[in-house]
Structure formats: structure tokens, C-alpha cells
Amino acid sequence: MVQNIDYAPTFLELAGVKVPEDIQGESLLPLLKGKKPAGWRKSLYYHFYEYPAEHMVKRHYGVRTDPYKLIHFYNDIDAWELYDLEKDPAEMHNVINDPAYSEVLADMQAELKKLQIQYNDTDFVK
């Protein structure tokens, strides 16, 4: 899994410039060379702050893995959504209250908290 935060360290490495230790992303060069580094991320964290805006998507943050996505909408609402992306790639069926996903939900909540701390986005960490 790659993110836009990976571009800066990739370009810096390509230019032969030392990548600052506090940069959040990882260089994509190993992946571009066909090698997956040990410990490469298995999940992505994102935080969407802009609302209202043209797209009218409410403020939210979330975590995504290959099979699942957990989202928390906040500010003027407090709503959680969990999607099984293998069964529902269009994210049309929220399974947050489905008992069959209780273990997945707990794992995703733990991963979300871990990533919020890692990226120092801790205003919403409980």
C-alpha cells in the first residue's frame, strides 16, 4: 500500500538527498525495483478535514487495509462505518453492527489508534 506522503521521500532519494527522519512517508524506490521492504505498511491512515467544500464530504478519518475500511465521521455527527472491501468494494453495506465482524472491528480500531499515534494525529484518540 502506498500513499501520497511517499512521493517526497522517493524524490529526495532519487535526487541523492538525505531523507529527513521526521518525514512521514517511505521511499517507493524498493517497490519500483520490484522489492517489497520488510515491514512495509499493511494499512493506511487518512484524515479528511475539509468540510464544507465542493465535494460536501463530512469530516472524517479512517484506516484501510486490503480487506477492510473503518471510517469515523465527526464534528457535527458521530458515525462509524466498517466495510468489507472484498465483498463490498463500492462501500454500500456498512457492517459496523454485524456481530460477524466484531473481531475485525476490534482489530481495525486498534490499528486506527496505532496509526493516529504514529502520525501524531491524536486529537481523537481515546
Predicted region positions:
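Residue-level signal for the nucleotide or nucleotide-sugar donor/cofactor binding architecture
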Residues: 2
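C-terminal cap/loop subdomain of S1 sulfatases and analogous C-terminal strand-loop tails that border
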Residues: 5-8, 13-81, 85, 103, ...
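Intrinsically disordered, low-complexity polar regions and short flexible loop motifs
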Residues: 88
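Phosphate-coordinating loops and pocket residues in cytosolic domains that bind phosphorylated ligands
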Residues: 94-97
